């Protein structure tokens, strides 16, 4: 049995995506996981919907070849709506075993005022989370060693 059969990776199009992907590569190699890349198109009006969906797909189209080139099974999904809600919904719908995502490490005041994407996901799902800080630097894929209790 594979511990992480499917890893969901919500992308926000910022440099933290690279750090998250390095960790995901190591885990996917260790567990022969399918990687599901998610970009949520968050739009406020119908007029911006097509543009946001196209932008989301463009982000996925830039990232997927990096993983496919290493031989991973990769699926891309464009979500629609509120990013945290859609991430939780997709994780459940796609039967994911792990959500690997970046966190920008904003201060406590900003989290209280605006909320935190990672916090909202954490409170809304039972799927395990791997959180990678934006300022953690890009870890080489070979430097991540998953510890597993058998």
Residue ranges with predicted function:
Residues 2-50, 149-150:
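Small/aliphatic-rich secondary-structure junction motif
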Residues 26, 90-140, 146-150:
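Gly/Ser-rich helix-loop-strand patches that form or flank binding pockets
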Residues 36, 75, 130:
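Conserved beta-strand positions in the Rossmann-like core of class I SAM-dependent methyltransferases
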Residues 50-61:
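Short, surface-exposed alpha-helical segments at coil->helix boundaries
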